[in-house]
């Protein structure tokens, strides 16, 4: 899984015709960033100083993330081998990617 800058990277790459995103959805934690922290002793207040402009257009990605073109659900096989890479290589050898 990825989030933050990873969300941004996947979102940008999906705009290219030759890119096929394989895996699981990103985490969707890109809308607010550059957090500052104020320490009050017993607690801390953390707040963002940047906000993605897409939030104003109702197109924020909080809790949505970026959906892959080909979803590969997580499984225990991921502990043993790189399932995502294996699928990508399979698609390349089949010639079925963009």
Where in the sequence are the language-model features?
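C-terminal "post-core" interaction segments
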Residues: 1-98
């Amino acid at each position: 899984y990825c989030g933050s800058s990873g969300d941004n990277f996947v979102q940008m790459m999906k705009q290219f015709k030759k890119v096929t995103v394989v895996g699981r959805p990103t985490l969707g934690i890109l809308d607010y960033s550059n957090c500052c922290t104020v320490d009050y002793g017993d607690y801390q207040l953390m707040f963002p100083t940047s906000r993605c402009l897409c939030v104003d257009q109702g197109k924020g990605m909080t809790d949505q993330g970026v959906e892959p073109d080909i979803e590969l659900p997580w499984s225990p096989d991921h502990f043993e081998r790189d399932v995502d890479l294996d699928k990508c290589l399979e698609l390349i050898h089949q010639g079925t990617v963009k």
